[in-house]
Amino acid sequence: MAHRDIDDTGRAGERTDRAAGRQQGTAPDEEPQPLSPTAARDLFADRAPLGLVRLFEASVPLVLDGEPVEDEERMHADLAGPLHLTPLGRGDDTVLAAFTDRTAMLEAVRREDTAYEELSPEQVEQARASAKKICVSNPTALDARVCFFEDAGEQGDVKCLGPELGYPNLSRLPRGFLGTQNWNDVISSLSWCRFDVSLFDAFDWQGNEFFAPKGCTTPDLSRFGWGDRTASIVNWGS
């Protein structure tokens, strides 16, 4: 299915008093909210406990703080707080790596950054056609916006988000030709982006975090248990 571009990306504003304003009311809100320079620190300083637990049920192995997870239900029962998750590894060795500490997650991602190789255009197209995660060694050549899609493989309705911007409540972002639907629990794939992107499974950038590193494709979020799960999103702009 060909995608329908309904993008109307805003620019980062000058509000620096907080990460972004909390959503009020139920009226549609098509404008993304600007992030403050300290947003990454502020948003993760005091994470709310998880409410109803929804299993990831990823099709790749799940690893928690470096240890394989055999029983995901038991893992959630033993943990009170949200997790920070990201794909690590290549090809058949890819895992969904979960961390209780966000700094540890970022360190693991950056270690993997140094192992990326330069791909030829032919290799890039072959890899993208396979719907597997691939990463480029020079993400600065990519678009600063991230585009998120209704379906896997960058198909279906699409909306794009510029750097240093976020949507704290995707249920208020209209979707579809008539704008009668919304983006909550809909996102199934992401485009390549120059910057890091985070998805959250609760409003106001709370809940579990799925971290999509800059320069990497995310053609099928369901592979990592994140298909139709995202409630809020951030393009970090760095």
Segments from the language model and where they lie:
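Compact beta-sheet-dominated domain cores in extracellular/mature segments
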Residues: 2-238
